[in-house]
């Protein structure tokens, strides 16, 4: 583990443990596994599905939320990733799978307000039934996946953190998501297909 990532984790733990929110990835969807299409409502009250993006080569899928301090640290970086890669055929989709019963801040209305205030350049989708989060086995916010079109299927090519420094963007040494997308666009295998994610734990309601 790099010293920077260790220090970031330490800061995250101190800042978030008191809220019962901190968590680190223990198990997630397997890199290389297929991803089924989904259809979710965005903050503009439109339904969005992978199939809607004709000609997309892949997607950056980010599980995020409204209240998490770590998720808020990445807003500008997610906007930048969207601006850079959507024109190249790799849109970014942000998904909120947080339980609105546990966290009132995660209401759809608050999602709309956050997207407006922070000027999201990407769709912000409400996973009201938490189905998509479960399918990806997402555990934290922010947690990212790069999925790519392969043999008529969407497959996970990267899973983990956006980069290696949540606190100080200028000190990022490993832009994991950007590097993975660049390698895939160049027709190369992803050199780092999986990393640890860190942030606030996603609480899933018990399935009936």
Protein language model features and the residues they cover:
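Structural microenvironment flanking redox-active thiols in thiol-disulfide oxidoreductases
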Residues: 72-117, 128-135
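Short, thiol/selenol-centered motifs that function as redox-active sites or metal-ligating centers
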Residues: 65-74, 144, 200-203
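Loop/turn elements at helix/coil->beta-strand transitions in domains of secreted/extracellular proteins
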Residues: 56-59, 88-92, 119-123, 141
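Short, internal strand/loop/helix patches
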Residues: 112-156
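Non-globular targeting/processing and membrane-anchoring segments
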Residues: 23-55, 161-208
């Amino acid at each position: 583990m790099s010293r920077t990532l260790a220090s970031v984790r330490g800061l995250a733990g101190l800042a978030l443990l008191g809220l019962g929110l901190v968590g680190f990835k223990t198990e997630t969807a397997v890199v290389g596994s297929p991803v089924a299409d989904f259809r979710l409502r965005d903050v503009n009250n439109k339904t969005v599905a992978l199939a809607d993006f004709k000609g997309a080569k892949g997607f950056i899928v980010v599980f995020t939320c409204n209240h998490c301090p770590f998720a808020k640290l990445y807003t500008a970086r997610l906007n930048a990733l969207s601006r850079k890669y959507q024109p190249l055929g790799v849109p970014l989709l942000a998904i909120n799978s947080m339980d609105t019963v546990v966290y009132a801040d995660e209401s759809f209305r608050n999602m709309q307000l956050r997207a407006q205030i922070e000027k999201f350049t990407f769709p912000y989708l409400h996973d009201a039934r938490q189905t998509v989060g479960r399918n990806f086995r997402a555990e934290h916010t922010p947690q990212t996946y790069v999925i790519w079109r392969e043999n008529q299927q969407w497959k996970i090519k990267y899973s983990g953190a956006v980069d290696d420094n949540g606190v100080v963007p200028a000190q990022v040494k490993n832009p994991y998501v950007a590097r993975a997308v660049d390698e895939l666009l160049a027709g190369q295998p992803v050199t780092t297909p999986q990393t640890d994610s860190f942030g606030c734990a996603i609480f899933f309601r018990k399935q009936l």
